[in-house]
């Protein structure tokens, strides 16, 4: 347990509860220089202490009892003092002037199993947890305990240090430990069930004591608390802090840390590419969604920008700023996004407030559509009054058009069409397309693209990204063909028109358990930029954008050739975790040809890409990782027999394998090799002879600019 070097004042409002007496008794037993201090004595004696600790278990009726002493607390912090607020006391941060957004859950938890703090790996060097070798810190194992936490909202000024672990289960959406940098002072709030009155198992008692001592010591030592980055330099420092931890890709875009999902608001403005994305600054889990932001001059080298959109505590996006798009409204960059509030999700508008698109002004009359259309049986679920979200907007024939993703009760997924003269008043035109599927299906993140000879409509149906090729006639989509955009770990893509090409990015979700994502400190990546088009046969084409070649940092092979016989495996003179492989394959008389990447020297760990005589391209993940917590299923896509010989581009990036077959078919897979030496590449054949008529390989460089 950390030794306390400073003087601690235990705050109370005149009398001590049983819980408070137990905390004082524990504090005295640590040998700390400590004494109780009533609120009334704060003006006279508060300055004698290095740390003030308010530990309150009882409910607060009305105004916080410490609110009348906010001035003394402010002065104490201004002189460099530290303040610890535990249990329900953390709910008073707004009354004390520390925070503008208080915890949204203040309650009594019935604790029946070891529960406590789920510490963020990003801050595993925080002095409060210096004595721990685990991020999971139980502090209570039974009893009814008063708690405070952030669930649907985040503190505006503070930084989340920990969420909740309960009975061995991570509960990241319950955020219970927060730090505030009140330079030169500091505040730590511990709303977890930090109970001293109830006896606990020896191990739980030890971790409770160590965490409390650690927080008090960190505050007594005058350590500044971590703060959420507010500018580009801060975001870059955040990225550098996490580094390439736990398989983080180096040239596929990821958030600086924490959570990333759907790409949003893709736009080229003043010659620069902007990618916004769904981002949670509180950790690597889906909750309290903001819009992250990055810029690039070439689509492959990125610079982190400040968070662009944050939920407004009293607005229609209180619970999250969800997916949407960006358009140029006569010279004004404009976002249309889904705002979440309780069980409601509706479209909101924001306009750029600076040329760099770093700050945005939300429309005062948001939401711009106040309800789903009358007479349409939009699906309702346990989570939402109406599944009605995600927006694609374009201008045609002098009017704005918008499609919204939804599901129709007993019918399936659907895309609804609206029109507007000004982006603010919208008229419902009817369903653009309704699926033929299960009645509980929702089509998310719809997008309608103009590919010249054809229009492409794609939707994400919780599992895959389905696309339809055809045209729009009288406000309805005519389907001429359909397919799957990517047959692997790929979801919710969004596109931008860049001259005469359509460039698309998709979200690459993780394929490992929640605990592994938490421990890594990051989650989610974006695909490489893809150019979508149709070929002379009217079928969809997909290829990496030409700019991807700019990542090439050194060539390992140049149009090499080799053949492999039945049962033979040949190691190639290529290795690494950031690679591009460009191959021409022919099965000859073999049943299969295998390309293995991220392979250990003994072959026990490898990701195998298998091309079969039946016209399938398969990613076999059964040996891809020694980690039992990752997904190990096999992914496959049809590659029609006339595609032989096969042209294959394979991009390897730590935990990403992204495949392009004949510029038509895509499969992106998430894999997590555990061995440092799993960097090899080999080929093998079964059932006969196979040939690589051309093989080129490059090492690829990092995709970030600081």
Where do the protein language model's features map onto the residues?
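Conserved Ser/Thr-centered positions that define the repeating blades of beta-propeller domains
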Residues: 296, 352-354, 417-423
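Surface loop/turn signatures of beta-propeller and other carbohydrate-active proteins
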Residues: 228-264, 283-286, 300-328, 357-395, ...
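Structural motif
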Residues: 11-16, 39-40, 54-58, 86-89, ...
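Catalytic beta-strand/loop cores that center a nucleophilic Ser/Cys/Thr
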Residues: 19-21, 25, 30, 109-201
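Beta-rich accessory regions
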Residues: 235-239, 466, 472-491, 496-706
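A glycine-rich, often tryptophan-bearing local segment used as a flexible ligand/cofactor-contacting loop or short
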Residues: 58-140, 211
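Aromatic-Pro/Gly-enriched surface loop or interdomain linker
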Residues: 1-51, 224-226
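Hydrophobic core segments of beta-strands in well-ordered, beta-rich domains
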Residues: 262-282, 306, 322-351, 368-369, ...
